[in-house]
Structures are given as C-alpha cells and as structure tokens.
Amino acid sequence: MNKKSIRDVDLKGKRVFCRVDFNVPMKEGKITDETRIRAALPTIQYLVEQGAKVILASHLGRPKGQVVEELRLTPVAARLGELLGKDVKKADEAFGPVAQEMVAAMNEGDVLVLENVRFYAGEEKNDAELAKEFAALADIFVNDAFGAAHRAHASTAGIADYLPAVSGLLMEKELDVLGKALSNPDRPFTAIIGGAKVKDKIGVIRHLLDKVDNLIIGGGLAYTFVKALGHEIGLSLCEDDKIELAKEFMQLAKEKGVNFYMPVDVVITEEFSETATTKIVNIDSIPSNWEGVDIGPKTREIYADVIKNSKLVVWNGPMGVFEMTPFSQGTKAVGQALADAEGTYSVIGGGDSAAAVEKFGMADKMSHISTGGGASLEFMEGKELPGVVCLNDK
C-alpha cells in the first residue's frame, strides 16, 4: 500500500483523532455483536503503546444530524474499556469546549471516545467547518474505519484537509488484501457473486471479468441470468430490465476466457418460512408458481470443486435466503468449501457473506473477512474511496 500508516509517523505525546467504525448492532442499550469494536483493538492498542493521546470518533446508526439518546456511544465506550482493560473516558459531544477540555486533560496513552459524529448535520455533508472543529482537537488524523471509507464525510475525509492523515492497522490490512486481489492475484482467482439483485453487483461483475479466472454466480441475482438463457424461472426474483446486461456479461466472460458458473439445479419453494416445503429441480424445470431460493446439491458440488482448485477466492453475497434454515444449505456449502480448502486464500467481502460465515461458525477458518460491506464492494468495482484518497502518500 502506498499510503502512510500509523507505523510511519511519530505518535508519542501526539493528540490523535482516530476515526473507527463502532457502528455495532444494539438492542435495548446492549451491544449484540461487538465484531467491529474488536477489529479496531490492534490500532487502538498500538496508539496507546506508542504514547499517543487517543481520541476515538465513530458514527452509530442513522440519527440524521440530531441527538438520538439510544444512539449515544456510551455503551460502546464502556465495552471498549473492558476489552482494553483500562479506563476509557466518554465525551457527550464530538467537538467544542467540553471535548477540548477533556482532550487537554489527557495523558499519554489515555483513550477518549467522542460522541456519535452523525449527531451533527455537517458530518454526512462533509462540512468544512465541522471538519475544522474535529481537526482542532488533534495533531494527527488516523482513518481506521474501512467500513465508512466509501463515504466522503467530515470525520472520514474532510478532516484530512487540516491534519496529517494516515491509515490505521485495520485500514492498512483491508487495502493490502483487497488491493493485492485486484492488482496481483494468485491464480486461479475465483470470484463468487451472490445476493438478491443484479443492479447492486453490476459494477463488481464488470470490473472482475477483467481479473478473474472463474466467476461463480448464485443468490437471487442468478435467476436474471437463467432467464437470459431462455429458461422459465417461475416466481423467482428477476430484473427484466437487466436481462440484456446478463447476456452481455455471459458473452464478455466467453470473450475473456473466464469460466462462468451458474446454478445447474436449485431449491424451490412455494412459501417463505422455517417449515417450508422445498423441492430440488434442474435449472430449466422451475414450475410456474414456485420460486428458486437456493442453489441445489449438484451446483454445490461443482462450486466446491472450483473453490478447492483456486488459490484466491473473493466472496460477495450469499447463494440463497440463508437466514431461513431450509434455504441456507447452498451458502453454508460454499462457506464449508472455503473452510476446507487447503492453500486457498479466502476473502469475504463484508455484509451478508460475513454474516453468513459468522452464523455458521466458520469465521475463524476464513483468511480475511472484510469489515466493510459497501466499501469493499466499491473497492472491488475499481472505485476510489474518499476515506483512502485523502490519506498521505508514503
């Protein structure tokens, strides 16, 4: 990575405004999944060890520029203190006199969590005045929030106009792993693209067709491709306005010598429920009043075989409606194939794929799970991320 990281700068005694991604799911004031807090720990611990004064900023939920009591970062700060094993202070504002006083009282190695930056309307507008207020608290800006790197907000990008800007360790790892996958992948390189809609994955499919050896398609978006081949798909998800595009992608794959894998059989159902009756049919035999909801057993075997023979696999999007047990086997099988594959580097592109490997207890078997759903998708589309562009070059 050609961007400076916290390893490239002197941090001792410096006030560091570190943007992290503490946007964790909460229920009645309790954190239900602390993955994102844990992901930021190496950076925070490094800053503490180097003798920095660590000022942490994050958003939580979508308060839309006003104070929402249940979206305060107080429970997050408390949990962070437990995980770090040290006293973590919490400011009830993200800038201004109160925050400035608390920063002024900090010693080297102290940690302070600022209030939810999205309580201020200027955050999502990337307001220069707000960015200046954030910058006034610190000597150095560290961006470790890969999950918000695709947003040009005051605390992720704007602040870098007023302070030296470097990446944290998590951001650095994300950029290294995803960057290598796109620029210099180990081969065979396979991309698995799933999820509900073609329109969400157009950019990533288009970009990856130039890079990959194998492209595997699954999830709801597969049925648009199936229909493009002239098959009936019953009540399965389909974007009729994307059928021509699906044909174009299949033609492009052929021209570029990319092996294009689609379901050969599917799990179908007449209702969405945990007790639904399902059938397995060949891809060209979906009855008119049934809906495809998962890849079938033959498809799972084919996909597992491709995965096993790949050196690098990037996975973005589930193979079916994995939240419901009867329709979860395809997604689980892909996860299992990645977990079992020897000598295969697996990159899970955040979002639903990350949720799936967590759910099936396979997370620790994956080489890299991205902390950014939208950010990793945009990165894999070849887009520049505002939260990365703003960092100082080495």
UniProtKB/Swiss-Prot annotation:
GO cellular component, one term: cytosol
Primary location group: cytoplasm
Catalytic activity: (2R)-3-phosphoglycerate + ATP = (2R)-3-phospho-glyceroyl phosphate + ADP
Associated pathway: Carbohydrate degradation; glycolysis; pyruvate from D-glyceraldehyde 3-phosphate: step 2/5
Keyword ATP-binding: yes
EC numbers on record: 2.7.2.3
Binding residues for substrate: 21-23, 36, 59-62, 118, 151
Keyword entries, A-Z: ATP-binding, Cytoplasm, Glycolysis, Kinase, Nucleotide-binding, Phosphoprotein, Transferase
Phosphothreonine carried by residues: 299
GO BP field: gluconeogenesis; glycolytic process
GO molecular function: ADP binding; ATP binding; phosphoglycerate kinase activity
Residues carrying Phosphoserine: 183
CDD domains assigned to the protein according to its UniProt record, in alphabetical order: Phosphoglycerate_kinase
PROSITE patterns per UniProt: PGLYCERATE_KINASE
Subcellular location: Cytoplasm
InterPro entries: Phosphoglycerate_kinase (IPR001576), Phosphoglycerate_kinase_CS (IPR015911), Phosphoglycerate_kinase_N (IPR015824), Phosphoglycerate_kinase_sf (IPR036043)
Pfam family, one: PGK
Quaternary context: Monomer.
Similarity-based family: Belongs to the phosphoglycerate kinase family.
The protein's name in its UniProt record: Phosphoglycerate kinase
Protein species of origin: Bacillus cereus (strain AH187)
Taxon lineage: Bacteria, Bacillati, Bacillota, Bacilli, Bacillales
Gene expressing this chain: pgk
